[in-house]
Swiss-Prot record:
Pfam families documented for this protein: Ribosomal_S11
Gene that encodes it: rpsK
InterPro entries: Ribosomal_uS11, Ribosomal_uS11_bac-type, Ribosomal_uS11_CS, Ribosomal_uS11_sf
Name assigned to this protein: Small ribosomal subunit protein uS11
Record's GO cellular component terms: ribonucleoprotein complex; ribosome
Primary role: Located on the platform of the 30S subunit, it bridges several disparate RNA helices of the 16S rRNA. Forms part of the Shine-Dalgarno cleft in the 70S ribosome.
Any one biological process term the GO annotation gives: translation
Domain of life: Bacteria
Assembly and oligomerization: Part of the 30S ribosomal subunit. Interacts with proteins S7 and S18. Binds to IF-3.
HAMAP family reported for this sequence: Ribosomal_uS11 (MF_01310)
Keywords in alphabetical order: Ribonucleoprotein, Ribosomal protein, RNA-binding, rRNA-binding
Family of the protein in this entry: Belongs to the universal ribosomal protein uS11 family.
Organism annotation: Methylocella silvestris (strain DSM 15510 / CIP 108128 / LMG 27833 / NCIMB 13906 / BL2)
GO molecular function, one term: rRNA binding
Length: 129
């Protein structure tokens, strides 16, 4: 008795007009996630998934490529307007935002949601180069 092959179901195309783009830019990478208003993920991409490795992941160009890829996937679901939440200290923040605008999305608001401590944990030691 052979096992019946499980069929891989393709994701159905949701028709979502507006959403939230979460741009998380660290010193080493840039991650972009586009969600609907409830927070369910529609599409995501990062500089690492675009094929950049090592120190190239932290470049603005890598962030731009990741944002374009994420925007293309979200546009397939019918998304047109975005609120952008930018977080982190990395170099890919502005270029990812510009790439989302250039992809044809209407950006309604831009929020910086970088967590700032009220003197919480001790920071890591300063780099001496």
């Amino acid at each position: 008795m052979a096992k019946e092959a499980t069929r891989v179901r393709r994701r159905e195309r949701k028709n979502i007009v507006s959403g939230v783009a979460h741009v998380n830019s660290t010193f080493n990478n840039t991650m972009i996630t586009i969600t609907d208003a409830q927070g369910n993920t529609i599409s995501w991409s990062s500089a690492g998934t675009m094929g950049f490795k090592g120190s190239r992941k932290s470049t603005p160009y890598a962030a731009q490529m990741a944002a374009e890829d994420c925007a293309r996937k979200a546009a397939e679901h019918g998304m047109r307007t975005l609120e952008v939440e930018v977080s982190g200290p990395g170099s890919g923040r502005e270029s990812a935002l510009r790439a989302l605008q250039a992809a044809g999305f209407t950006v309604t608001s831009i929020r910086d949601v970088t967590p700032i401590p009220h003197n919480g944990c001790r920071p890591r030691k300063r780099r001496r180069v």
